[in-house]
């Protein structure tokens, strides 16, 4: 056997076995490290501290203020939106005005500085989500955000991973009591990855 034939066999072994196995190992390592090091804001249970204490249990639960009163952007824009200080003061100009939290709220309003709430439900930058079709189809906020009306301090109830979205898109009956095949959400990549 000549040297030329021998080196050809080694190349075949390399390209048919070692190269694919090596590429798979590198890919698995990259995906594993990416999964493991994913920031907390994408994980279930994420509960950042907020600049002013706010009880969803009181407002959405006991007082039964609808989600869309404060998060009015949900039915008409991609983002649900965080209420402005002015929205809070619609009630708190006359209600609980001596509360330390309400005094802090009023101080933000007087100073003209924005109140920067820490976002709880966040998606990676490469994911596009539009609240409009979900809210307008009658999907309850609790489907993705959990029973917020029972939470003193809101936390991320479920992981905001693609598998959760696809679960509803493929079987909308879990989210929509009267779902039909036409109510299924799109499953193609561009629907969410833009």
Listing of model-derived features with the role each one plays in the protein:
Residues 106-109:
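Amphipathic alpha-helical "stem/stalk" segments
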Residues 30-48:
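Aromatic-capped interface at the extracytoplasmic side
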Residues 1-12:
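N-terminal Lys/Arg-rich, disordered targeting/topogenic segments
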Residues 16-34:
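Hydrophobic membrane-insertion alpha-helices, especially the h-region
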Residues 111-131, 135:
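Alpha-helix-centered segments that form part of catalytic cores
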Residues 48-103, 127-194:
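Sequence context surrounding c-type heme c attachment/ligation sites in exported
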Residues 38, 48-50, 113, 125:
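Glycine-rich, flexible loop/turn motifs
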């Amino acid at each position: 056997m000549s040297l030329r034939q021998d080196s050809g066999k080694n190349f075949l072994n390399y390209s048919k076995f070692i190269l694919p196995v090596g590429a798979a190992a590198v890919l698995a390592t990259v995906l594993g490290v990416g999964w493991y090091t994913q920031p907390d804001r994408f994980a279930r249970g994420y509960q950042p501290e907020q600049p002013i204490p706010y009880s969803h249990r009181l407002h959405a639960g006991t007082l039964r203020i609808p989600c869309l009163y404060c998060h009015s952007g949900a039915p008409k824009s991609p983002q649900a939106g965080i209420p402005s200080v002015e929205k809070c003061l619609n009630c708190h100009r006359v209600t609980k005005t001596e509360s330390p939290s309400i005094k802090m709220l009023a101080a933000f309003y007087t100073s003209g500085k924005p109140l920067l709430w820490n976002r709880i439900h966040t998606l990676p930058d490469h994911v596009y989500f539009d609240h409009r079709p979900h809210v307008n189809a009658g999907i309850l906020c609790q489907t993705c955000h959990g029973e917020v009306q029972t939470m003193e301090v809101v936390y991320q109830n479920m992981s905001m991973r693609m598998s959760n979205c696809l679960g509803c898109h493929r079987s909308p009956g879990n989210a929509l009591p009267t779902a039909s095949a036409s109510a299924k959400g799109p499953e193609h990549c561009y629907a969410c990855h833009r």
